[in-house]
């Protein structure tokens, strides 16, 4: 059974259909990448997974239960499906350590000592423990990304979803984040990632989903999508900028 199963997902904003019958599955331990042109519905799809955006119709099953139901405990769902935002969403007035421990203390009701221990574990795993007393403004973009990931992992989610994790990073930092994703994947962390970056996508996942105008048009390796797919729009998207070797 898939950890997350999306069936016929539709999201409309007034008369504008952003997602139009999306179907996909995410398996335990899988790292799934979603790509597509700007405005195709990628970020909206992620936000539907933990009800940051309410679907218009369709179902999203998490561990076999439809989480679009009105009876769903949305707060518990958001602890199970962690979200790492494009701009990291760190609290500027809190240290790195306190950014990670805040939800542990407020939502999981951990003592400060317990929360500090958990935060130290996650920050150490991401090579950020030496920065635990710094403030976000003292960190590089890549370091901020690691703090945001540590904060999500500290809640022990079943899935972590990432919205454009490399959009604010230079090429060196992008490689570092790719290495981090691969390490987390080896640790059996289940992830779904939206990205516009073909090189990054190739570094972290064999296959990608292509979303266009709210519809899943294809799922395959970037190489096959760029050269062998029957849809010219798909070939053009994945063959752009010489990203296919």
Regions found by a protein language model. Give the residues of each.
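ABC ATPase NBD coupling module
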Residues: 67-82, 112-113, 186, 226-229
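Catalytic Walker B motif of ABC-type/P-loop ATPase nucleotide-binding domains
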Residues: 160-163
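A short, proline-enriched helix->beta-strand linker immediately N-terminal to the Walker B motif
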Residues: 154-158
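Conserved ABC ATPase "signature" region
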Residues: 66, 108, 112-130, 179
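Conserved ABC ATPase signature
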Residues: 135-139, 143
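Helix-to-loop junction immediately C-terminal to a conserved catalytic motif
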Residues: 50
């Amino acid at each position: 059974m898939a950890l997350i199963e999306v069936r016929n997902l539709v999201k409309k904003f007034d008369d504008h259909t952003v997602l139009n019958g999306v179907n996909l599955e995410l398996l335990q331990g899988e790292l799934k990448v979603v790509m597509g042109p700007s405005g195709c519905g990628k970020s909206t799809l992620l936000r539907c997974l933990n009800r940051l955006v309410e679907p218009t119709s369709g179902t999203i099953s998490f561990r076999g239960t439809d989480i679009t139901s009105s009876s769903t405990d949305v707060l518990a769902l958001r602890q199970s499906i962690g979200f790492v935002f494009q701009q990291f969403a760190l609290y500027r007035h809190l240290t790195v350590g306190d950014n990670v421990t805040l939800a542990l203390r407020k939502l999981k009701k951990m003592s400060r000592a317990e929360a500090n221990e958990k935060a130290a574990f996650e920050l150490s795993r991401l090579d950020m423990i030496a920065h635990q007393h710094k403030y976000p403004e003292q960190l590089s973009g890549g370091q901020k990304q690691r703090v945001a990931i540590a904060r999500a992992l500290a809640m022990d989610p079943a899935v972590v979803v990432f919205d454009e994790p490399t959009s604010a990073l230079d090429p060196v930092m992008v490689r570092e984040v790719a290495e981090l994703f691969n390490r987390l994947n080896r640790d059996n962390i289940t992830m779904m990632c939206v990205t516009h970056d073909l090189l990054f996508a190739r570094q972290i996942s064999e296959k990608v989903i292509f979303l266009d105008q709210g519809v899943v048009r294809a799922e395959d390796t970037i190489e096959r999508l760029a050269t062998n797919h029957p849809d010219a729009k798909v070939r053009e998207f994945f063959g752009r900028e010489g990203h296919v070797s």
